[in-house]
Design a protein with these regions (language model features):
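Short, low-complexity N-terminal intrinsically disordered segments enriched in polar/charged residues
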Residues: 19-66
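A beta-strand edge to alpha-helix "cap/lid" segment located at domain peripheries
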Residues: 21-33, 96-175
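A solvent-exposed, acidic/Ser-Thr-rich amphipathic alpha-helical stretch
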Residues: 57-124
Length: 175
């Protein structure tokens, strides 16, 4: 009887250990996936900025879903969104063409991930330099991006972006 009890206890203990191990492995896999997703989302935002600095709009469009939306808020007023890669790409190219120097410095990012959808807030300081009316002008802006991302075929893409220009300063650069 004692042997039966010990055998039964051993089987229950082993089963419990196996279940605990499976739970820990599953939890660890989810945590690793979340870390990978967070790194991928930060890389997505930084790559967007790097490509903007180089005026590589075609490559930037690869970071968006086909039906993406991008809108801008300036002075508290939201402009109508650009919808679709073609409209977004044209708007970006036209705007960046105004400047010979484009510089983005990204800061903090927070994201909430829910499966293959994520929402994020990113901060960026943008410096744009161009010639206007014969003067070398520098625009410096603090931008807060409110993004919605989707993971498609294992790759995170921007589905929606609202660029809120929280402040903006324009000054003439003296030579």
């Amino acid at each position: 009887m004692k042997n039966i009890f010990l055998s039964l206890f051993a089987v229950l203990a082993i089963t419990s250990c196996i279940q605990t191990n499976a739970y820990v492995q599953n939890k660890s896999a989810k945590e690793v996936q979340e870390i990978q997703d967070r790194i991928a989302l930060k890389n997505l935002v930084d790559t967007f900025s790097n490509l903007a600095d180089e005026k590589k709009v075609t490559e930037q469009m690869e970071l968006f879903t086909d039906d993406a939306e991008v809108s801008t808020i300036e002075n508290g007023q939201e402009r109508p969104p650009y919808v679709g890669k073609q409209a977004i790409g044209k708007a970006f190219a036209n705007y960046l063409a105004l400047f010979h120097t484009v510089y983005h410095s990204n800061g903090q990012q927070t994201v909430e991930i829910n499966g293959n959808i994520a929402k994020g807030i990113s901060y960026c300081q943008v410096v744009l330099i161009g010639n206007f009316d014969g003067k070398e002008m520098q625009r410096t802006a603090g931008v807060r991006y409110s993004d919605t991302y989707v993971k498609k075929d294992g790759k995170w893409l921007i589905k929606k972006r609202v660029s809120n220009f929280m402040y903006s300063e324009m000054k003439e650069l003296k030579k």
